Amino acid sequence: MTLAFDIEARDPHSRARAGRITTAHGVIETPVFMPVGTRGSIKSLTPDEVRNHGAQIILGNTYHLYLQPGHELIARMGGLHHFMGWDGPILTDSGGFQVFSLVYGGIADEIKGRRPTQQVQPGMVKVTDDAVIFKSYIDGSMHVFTPERSIEIQKGIGADIILCFDELPPFHAGYDYTARSLERTHAWERRCLMFHRATQEGGLPFVPPNPYQALFGIVHGGVFPDLRRASAEYLRELPFDGLCIGGSLGENKQQMREVVDMTVPHMPDHLPRHLLGIGDVDDLIECVARGIDMFDCVSPTRLGRHGTALVRDAERRWKLNVANAALRDDPTPLDAWCDCYTCRRYSRAYIHHLFRAQELLGIRLVSLHNVAFLLKLMRTIRQSIIEGRFAHLRAEWLGI
């Protein structure tokens, strides 16, 4: 075992639990939300800013870091921790999500019923039982990802937790295609595990040995209960350090939660569980209640760039448009519950002005607020589980 996971408290009314994951770069208290640093940075924010607002772990995207600047360069620079100036734990995805999202769109697209907006050229992605062949979105060059190649790249990046390479079928895929895809993904996960263990003590020319690097498997099966169960039961027999719920999560929030409901009971209790790509306020609370320990999502900074601030207001669906004219003379902070730098120092009126004037500071302040808001939410959830108040928190925030 290359990381330790200890469960400290459980909620008697749900599957919610509070725990601690110990890694080589520090302890992660769960449930936890990790900001996403797609290309080695959390957009518009410094590592110190997110650390000082409570970030414990961040996620890096293997696909993007492989294409630019390249995993071998990152390895020569001492790994992603040293390269980007972040001294806490890092998790990297496998690259599969981004490759398949070029064709099918991402998790957020599925749940909101959107089709991919990026124009995909013919031949941009080809899938075989052995590998995925794709064109770089940067220069059109051709690249091949095998399970082994994905693990090699992630080892070069040097994350504390790495993920298996997997196929991402779309939510509209039928049962037969999803079942075939699941077989392929399970074969790829076995290959990832074998290569990871064979190279953990060394053997890659540009990567120092890292016996503390953990590998998570990914449960697939689309929206089909028997496939989700089969995947979870298959993976729990393999020596992974944790498991993710990935693949298609359905076409709306309710279906996503049903996928979590049908999957978690078949996952090992002693391993951390990560729900990939989910970060809305209500989803975080509801999926903690369903037994999820770890979350990641690009939404806090993406919303920030587009002038949307997270607020504690279910009637607004947790979102406030800072460019709204009603905020022009509003002296209050973005959110009275939040204690981030933005909310301590600036008014809604000032942030409204920044966005209307197209000042970059506006993007930074709202992005920082959004990240800090979710990080505080997760700390509050964790404390409520430890103190036996999670059911009250759930009712208070969601009105249920």
From Swiss-Prot:
Cofactor binding notes: Binds 1 zinc ion per subunit.
Enzyme superclass (EC): transferase
Catalytic activity, as annotated: 7-aminomethyl-7-carbaguanine + guanosine(34) in tRNA = 7-aminomethyl-7-carbaguanosine(34) in tRNA + guanine
Active site per UniProt: D93 (proton acceptor), D296 (nucleophile)
Keywords of this entry: Glycosyltransferase, Metal-binding, Queuosine biosynthesis, Transferase, tRNA processing, Zinc
Entry EC number(s): 2.4.2.29
Region annotated RNA binding, chain positions: 277-283, 301-305
Keyword Phosphoprotein in annotation: no
Requisite cofactors: Zn(2+)
Amino acids binding Zn(2+): C338, C340, C343, H369
Record's function text: Catalyzes the base-exchange of a guanine (G) residue with the queuine precursor 7-aminomethyl-7-deazaguanine (PreQ1) at position 34 (anticodon wobble position) in tRNAs with GU(N) anticodons (tRNA-Asp, -Asn, -His and -Tyr). Catalysis occurs through a double-displacement mechanism. The nucleophile active site attacks the C1' of nucleotide 34 to detach the guanine base from the RNA, forming a covalent enzyme-RNA intermediate. The proton acceptor active site deprotonates the incoming PreQ1, allowing a nucleophilic attack on the C1' of the ribose to form the product.
Family: Belongs to the queuine tRNA-ribosyltransferase family.
Subunit structure: Homodimer. Within each dimer, one monomer is responsible for RNA recognition and catalysis, while the other monomer binds to the replacement base PreQ1.
HAMAP family registered for this protein in UniProt: Q_tRNA_Tgt
Protein known as: Queuine tRNA-ribosyltransferase
